[in-house]
């Protein structure tokens, strides 16, 4: 069994000793090739290189997304969470702690345990658990810019994301006009915010789950959350 461990050294909480500890744990069940990312989209290229039976993403949800989009046909994927939120890993039932999660991954590889996970596609890019348009997309864009200008490449905390969303709402007078038109089940709908969920909960705010699409699941079709008008007070009700 050949395993490629792709680790993001800029993920929150990631240190080289932790990466080495995960590599040692996985080497108990497979031949491990360790690769470190050095920037955005690098994990896509690393995941796509031939020669691995299993590709393990170690980092946050951004690293997971890149590995998913680079994964070659026939290769399996595993996740070792090491980011600030690690939504996908938590939705899979993995521990939030990196080393216990690595132990579960090693156990699954040893036993040959696998799980099929349905994916979504937006703008020719796969996503694992959610895709947001409108407010969420703009807040994420702002946070990603600040990540490299103010936070040395590490993802800001959840409060920074909320602050970015509030600034976006403030710029629109604390209301999002219906700027988008979507086609959903044969109907044309105008909306100010759209979220597509592949699993429940949609995301987490620290330890608290954000419950927007409680019927979503990896084994079912995608769920859409459509909001016609959104004000700042509604953020806490989502």
Predicted feature descriptions by range:
Residues 1-55, 65, 103-104:
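ATP/NTP phosphate-donor binding region
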Residues 6-7, 37, 72-76, 80-193:
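Catalytic core of DAGKc-family lipid kinases
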Residues 20-24, 51, 72, 144-145, ...:
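Short, solvent-exposed amphipathic alpha-helical segments in soluble enzyme
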Residues 32-34, 110-112, 164-175, 216-238:
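Catalytic phosphate-donor-binding core of small-molecule kinases
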Residues 57-61:
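N-terminal glycine-rich "phosphate-gripper" loop used for MgATP/nucleotide binding
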Residues 62, 83, 133-134, 199-200, ...:
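Alpha-helix/helix-capping structural signal
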Residues 63-74:
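Short Gly/Thr/Asp-enriched flexible loops that form oxyanion-binding sites at enzyme active sites
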Residues 186-238:
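Internal anion-binding site segments
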């Amino acid at each position: 069994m050949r395993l490629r461990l792709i680790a993001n050294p800029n993920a929150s909480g990631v240190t080289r000793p932790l990466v080495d500890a995960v590599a040692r744990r996985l080497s108990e069940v497979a031949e491990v090739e360790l690769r470190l990312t050095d920037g955005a989209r690098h994990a896509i290229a690393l995941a796509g290189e031939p020669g691995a039976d299993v590709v393990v993403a170690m980092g946050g949800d951004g690293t997971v997304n890149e590995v998913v989009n680079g994964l070659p046909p026939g290769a399996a994927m595993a996740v070792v969470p090491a980011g600030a939120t690690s939504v996908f890993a938590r939705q899979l039932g993995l521990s939030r702690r990196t080393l216990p999660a690595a132990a579960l991954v090693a156990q699954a590889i040893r036993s040959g345990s696998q799980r099929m996970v349905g994916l979504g596609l937006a703008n020719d890019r796969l996503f694992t658990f959610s895709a947001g348009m409108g407010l969420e997309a703009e807040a994420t864009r702002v946070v990603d810019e600040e990540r490299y200008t103010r936070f040395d490449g590490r993802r800001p905390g959840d409060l920074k994301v909320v602050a970015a969303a509030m600034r976006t709402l403030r710029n629109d007078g604390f209301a999002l006009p219906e700027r988008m038109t979507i086609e959903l089940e044969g109907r044309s709908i105008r909306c100010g915010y759209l979220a597509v969920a592949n699993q429940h909960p949609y995301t987490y705010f620290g330890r608290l789950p954000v419950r927007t699409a409680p019927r979503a699941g990896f084994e079912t079709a995608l769920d859409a959350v459509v909001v016609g008008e959104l004000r700042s007070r509604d953020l806490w009700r989502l």
